[in-house]
Amino acid sequence: MHRRSSGSPVEDDAEDSPLVSRSPTESTAHGPNNNAFETAEKSRSQIAKRGTSFDLRRDNGASTPRSRNSGLWRTPSSSSTSSTTAMATASTETKSSSASFLMPLASQRLPMGTSPESSRFRSSRLRSPWTCSILTALTTLVASVFLFFIVRSFSARQAGEDGCGIPVMSPTFLHMVGFDTEHTRFASKYNLYLYREEGVDFYNQENLGLNGAPVLFLPGNAGSYRQVRSLAAEASRHFHDVVRHDQERIKAGTRSLDFFMIDFNEDMAAFHGQTLLDQAEYVNEAIAYILSLYHDPKRSRRDPELPDPSSVILIGHSMGGIVARTALTMSNYQANSVNTIVTMSAPHAKPPVSFDSDIVHTYKQINDYWREAYSQTWANNNPLWHVTLISIAGGSRDTVVPSDYASISSLVPETHGFTVFTSSIPDVWIGVDHLSITWCDQFRKAIIKSLFDIIDVRRASQTKPRAERMRIFKKWYLTGLEPVAERTLSQKEPNTLLTLEDKSNSILPQGQRLILRELGHRSGPKVYLLPVPPQGVSGKKFTLLTDQRFDKTGEHGNLEVLFCSVFPLQNGKFATVFSMNMDFSGGNTGSTRLACKNAAEDGIHLPASTPASKYPFDRVQPFSYLQYELEDLSEHQFVAIVDKADSPTKGWVLAEFSDSSDAVIRVRGGLGGLLSAGLKMRLPANRPMLTEIKIPALHSSLLDYKLQIVRHNHDKRQELFAPLLRQSISDPHESKFFVNVDKVDVNLHGVAPFMPPPLREQATLGGVSFQLWTDPSCGSTVDVSLKVDIAGSLGELVMRYRTVFAAFPLLVVALVLRKQFQMYDETGYFITFAEGLDTALRSSFPILLLAMSLLASSLATSAQIPPSDEPFQWPVNATETPIDFTKNDLLLGSQDAFFWFLVPVFGLISVGVCVILNYIALILLSVLSFIYGCLRTRSGYIKRNEKGTPIFSAPTARRRMINTAILLVLVSTLIPYQFAYMVACIVQLATCVRAQWHAKETRSTAHYNFSNYAHSIFILMLWILPINILVLLVWAHNLVVHWFMPFSSHHNVLSIMPFILLVETMTSGAMIPRVTTRLKHVTSMILFAIAVYSAVYGVSYAYLLHHLANILAAWFVVIYFFSSGFSLRRLWLILEGDDATQGKSEPGGSHQKKKP
């Protein structure tokens, strides 16, 4: 006779253990008025006599006998009655001759001990899987409340208004059919196009009309090449309407932009590292082909005197920006073929998801290459020396890629690139979402104008030198208020001679503020002079704000601002020095001559703030603003404000020199104090026009705030402008403007979780800065208050911790499984998932959360964080202090110990999510089980033994082995192992459906054990499924586009074999054998390791969660195969087909009952 698993509902192989019949006594026990479980308890002595079992614990002579197959016992049928009697009376039965051939279906007897723990679980073994304890219910309720408010906060987050204009375009896409398989192996998968604006760009079939600098657009993850049409259309129209009519710019080398674009067939590079590398390889081949087109005079209309282009400007959206950076690291990259990269909403710092090992390792290789290149001391050793990288982020409106990931401060020094937000760009001042960043009208105009400014076709590189390009990009993309913003005043020579009569009263007293409420109130131009304070006075700053535009030299507007110094007359030769002479002396001989510089180029645009203003992006003329430190004006004695209006004109000017002691307020104190008490301050009536409030403690991107500004006793009719507020941080360059400010929602992209440290470690964090422009002439005080927005802050967790909600629940599942197996190995009862969760909540779960909370706090406060297990170390020069770019990969990824409480919060939410998923799975299984039962009873016959126990039908062992072998061969050759995992999940679902139906039909402990066990394994596999599903989507997409090249990195058979073997074994209904020796601790250790890893590394390296679960499955397979004395002989017999009768009933074993 053969042994079965403890509580296994499966029929043993026919040739080893034929189907058995029931004795009359046993049959009576299963009558309608008797409880099967009472029979099981009352007949334990008989059970011990009838069967044998395999026990992994040592035989110390004190083992408690355990039942073999719960209370529903079968006596082996045979042609000899004496044989049956002998087996029934035997106190100990040795293994049959075929026992060593048994497949992994070993069993143990259920214990008959009377320990409190055993009694407790014996009394609860009938507990329904739907049962939920009060503790679990309360935990789920609290978690649901948290989750509700988080989702609600995220949906109503502080994202700002959508104010993008709609672009106008007439697109035509020309397919570059010549770029075929002779040039690239990806010709059948990807395509290259050229954009032509209908009615603007010249082209025909013979001549493509290439006349400018080549630009290549790279779409993002699952993006379309047609997204470039708004940018390309603006480039064509701007050149046609503006640039071509400016002869000075034409002579300076400015030409049109020839926009090419790549059709990646909507490939999903964000989910698959190999796809990212394939796209980068194709980009380099496309660049080589594009440059070759300019050598063909039949396709180009370029001036033959101009050099042929040697480089291409790359513009990448989303993952297209990563592809652009990757292209420069590939072996087929032509040196210096790319020197300018502009990316939009590209996740440079970290991959959007870490579910694929290839994408994580590819990111590491790319970022390490860029960091190492810029760490070189000499330019000759830096292959990226001439490359500028500009990363533009959309801000809070982007819910696809966290804008924090767009930061390149950990990759590129400030001399070669920077990160900026669209809300900072002058005349844009708006946050955009992930898709609208490619077509937003205000933004596309800024992008195209900046590109035209860096073009110089007189150079082979088609662009100006790197330093000049960086200066232009800063001018176009930064507000001009940043510390790194450059001022051109000191670099210019005086070009205007200003002549004033000596007795002029236009010179204001030192320190007096200039206020003009109207321009042209006197006939003719008028000059106002503000004396520059003497050098050595610390903290002085000049500021000027007006609603007029600054005139450049020679223009005829209403206002011109000059910085002047006294110019002595030298024999009347001054006229040949200056290009502009402004004489206000009236012809008097006694006059003062000033040599002046025009400040228009340093003018800064600010959004107009009036009592009628609503948004900073309103289509109205912006304010003009000038700001200089006193050190910048060391060469000048006067600031001249020239009112050139001939007649009274509506307009105003406000200018002054202010002290930093009055204009700058630094708020001391930590984050805790600000959170508890908030911030309140009053600005006096005699304050400067610009007041700056710096709060270093506010630097986290996880917190939102409410800012309120209240003005007292102010007269709107006398007010020159309404209060204007700028919120800013320095790294990355993020500024937000608020007009007509009253109440403000404040959120920022400062210090974010999991972000690598910058290349140059900052001594202190600058925090957030608020710059407030108010009209000081009103004589009113201003109250400023700031407090934390708790409800708004909850929504920030979604974007920053999205992957946490996939990793932390696996911690809960691992602890539940650990508790289930501990109780199973001790008592023989496999408790339900809900009961295991309740037990974990009362024991290991709080302890683990406490440990993780302490770890999170210590990681954030530790000055030297140990490097992670992943070898992500960037080699640096021996003389430099190495930077660990992975130090923020652990746990919460937070650099602030204040947020330690997020660990228990996420743990609490994970419990609720697991409970919800458990009940969703139970509902699904119940529905499918009901359908399964209906289909089974409609077959006409019901297979039942005499006691009414349905047979758990299963395929033969040989068939299971063949199925497994076929699937593994396919994995090693054609399909990725992720597809096999999905198949395993489906098979496990079917096993759970059958197990639940049998458990309901038989109401036996054996079937309940297996049903609970199969259900818990299914829950574990469900949490692993999202890690595999993304790569599976990439593979399926490749099949759709007829790309059949297999993934070289996803055919590791060992990555899926344990899961396949485990699932195939469970299809037979085999309950996993109990482990009662010290080896049972191996199960606990593996599950505990999965729980800890899920919390510590699960966000940054989520792909390893699959492999850890795979190790657990391998351990379960080992328990299955070797607990029953598995031998190669049994395997050979199965391959020979000796199991042909397995699962078939014999006449004496069961009968077939006709369906009524």
Swiss-Prot record:
Active site feature: 318
GO molecular-function terms, A-Z: phosphatidylinositol deacylase activity
Residues the record marks as carrying a glycan: 877, 1009
Keywords of this entry: Endoplasmic reticulum, Glycoprotein, Hydrolase, Membrane, Protein transport, Transmembrane, Transmembrane helix, Transport
Domain of life: Eukaryota
Chain intervals with Low complexity compositional bias: 75-95
Membrane spanning stretches: 131-151, 797-817, 845-865, 897-917, 966-986, 1016-1036, 1053-1073, 1081-1101, 1102-1122
Membrane topology type: Multi-pass membrane protein
GO biological processes: GPI anchor biosynthetic process; protein transport
Localization per Swiss-Prot or TrEMBL: Endoplasmic reticulum membrane
Compositional bias segments (type: Polar residues): 20-37, 61-72
Record's signal peptide: none
Residue numbers spanned by region Disordered: 1-95
Pfam families registered for this protein in UniProt: PGAP1 (PF07819), PGAP1_2nd (PF25141), PGAP1_TMD (PF25140)
Keyword Disulfide bond: no
Record EC number: 3.1.-.-
A GO cellular-component term linked to this record: endoplasmic reticulum
Protein function: Involved in inositol deacylation of GPI-anchored proteins which plays important roles in the quality control and ER-associated degradation of GPI-anchored proteins.
Family: Belongs to the GPI inositol-deacylase family.
Protein's name according to its UniProt entry: GPI inositol-deacylase
Organism: Aspergillus fumigatus (strain ATCC MYA-4609 / CBS 101355 / FGSC A1100 / Af293)
